[in-house]
Amino acid sequence: LNRGFKLTGRLGEVMKESAEIAYSYVIAHLKDYGCDQDFFDMSMVHLHVPEGATPKDGPSAGVTMATALVSLARKERIKRPLAMTGGLTLTGQVLPVGGIREKVIAARRSKIMELILPHANQRDFEELPD
């Protein structure tokens, strides 16, 4: 049986670490999220970050990756157009990230009106023009 966690794509070291933290956090908290605690013991998770040859780096996708893993383990889709960002620690603390302005603009361009941002980035968001 092939199981574990595999990352592919042009990911920088910080993003790889962020993905590994998200995976470790979710495995440690499966019960808290109402998931089968053996789910990842029986599964191979392959996370591929596309976008051509453009390298990706930074901690901003930690919360998003953890959310995707919980969604997978619960066998429940995230039902609405949604954008999110935030760093994540092994204890589940959500960390602020940079580039809030650019991320909000990208979400709006994609017609995504619901965003989840770290609380610590609230001021960055409030300072944006409408």
What spans do the regions from the language model cover?
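Peripheral, non-AAA+ core regions of ATP-driven protein-machinery
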Residues: L1-D130
